């Protein structure tokens, strides 16, 4: 088969070579098509004037139970719940809602970020991702899709593709999981951490010994998470 293929190539190219004429065997084409993104999201912007460099931004991805078209469902857990109860964060919080039957798509989330950045004064060196359960998976996936865009990520009770570990070695990562999680085993998070470590990265991981699937409540109520995030900035290309 290999020999036959080589012969065919020579036969087909021979007239081109002998003719002395330049023949373009491959044409260049460009697809330009706008793809509609129809996802609603919550945005919380601090009331104060933004810092000179702009507001940091945290993207929050909810779990499977909050999918749908009722945006109020997004307020059930995590930062949106805290904000609804009066919590004031010193950064912009963006909380999209994934339509039912769909999953978190990186290109859609990137489009949302672009739109929010266009409409607000945002420090693009301090953009963070966090999410719980399905949103934890979405956090890993989006970070691997565009690791150079983010300053830090905090996936909670999620998991990802361990082959992506090498893409995340320069990204600050703090992972959270409950040891007794029967929905998404803690091994999903542990394997991602191990993959990053094997590739040369240094992620953090917190395993709550007596927590089940809901380890996000105590995580999002812990001020240390936000302090850690806000101390991280996107790496410059020269630092890589």
State the predicted function of each range.
Residues 89-91, 168-173:
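Short, proline-enriched alpha-helix->beta-strand connector loops that line the catalytic pocket
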Residues 117-119, 125-169:
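Primarily recognizes the serine-hydrolase "nucleophile elbow" in alpha/beta-hydrolase
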Residues 18-57, 91, 130-132, 137, ...:
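A domain-start/cap signature at the N-terminus of enzymes
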Residues 2-17:
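Sec-dependent N-terminal signal peptides
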Residues 47-53, 101-134, 147:
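Gly/Ser-rich "nucleophile elbow"/oxyanion-hole loop immediately N-terminal to the catalytic nucleophile
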Residues 172-240:
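C-terminal catalytic histidine-bearing segment of alpha/beta-hydrolase fold enzymes
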Residues 57, 61-110:
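Active-site machinery of serine-nucleophile hydrolases
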């Amino acid at each position: 088969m290999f020999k036959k293929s080589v012969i065919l190539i020579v036969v087909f190219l021979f007239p081109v070579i002998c003719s002395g004429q330049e023949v373009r065997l491959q044409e260049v084409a460009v697809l330009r098509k706008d793809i509609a993104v129809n996802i609603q999201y919550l945005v919380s912007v601090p009331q104060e004037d933004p810092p000179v460099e702009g507001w940091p931004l945290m993207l929050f991805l909810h779990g499977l139970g909050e999918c749908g078209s009722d945006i109020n469902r997004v307020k059930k857990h995590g930062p949106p719940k805290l904000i609804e109860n009066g919590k004031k964060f010193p950064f912009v919080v963006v909380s999209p809602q994934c339509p039912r039957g769909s999953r978190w798509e990186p290109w859609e989330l990137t489009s949302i970020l672009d739109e929010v950045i266009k409409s607000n004064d945002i420090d693009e060196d301090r953009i963070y991702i966090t999410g719980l359960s399905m949103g934890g998976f979405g956090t890993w996936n989006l970070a691997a899709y565009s690791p150079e865009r983010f300053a830090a990520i905090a996936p909670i009770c999620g998991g990802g593709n361990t082959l992506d570990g090498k893409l995340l070695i320069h990204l600050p990562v703090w992972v959270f999981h409950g040891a007794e999680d029967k929905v998404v085993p803690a091994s999903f998070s542990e394997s991602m951490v191990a993959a990053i470590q094997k590739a040369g990265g240094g992620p953090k991981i917190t395993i709550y010994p007596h927590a089940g699937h809901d380890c996000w409540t105590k995580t999002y109520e812990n001020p240390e998470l936000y302090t850690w995030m806000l101390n991280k900035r996107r790496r410059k290309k020269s630092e890589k």
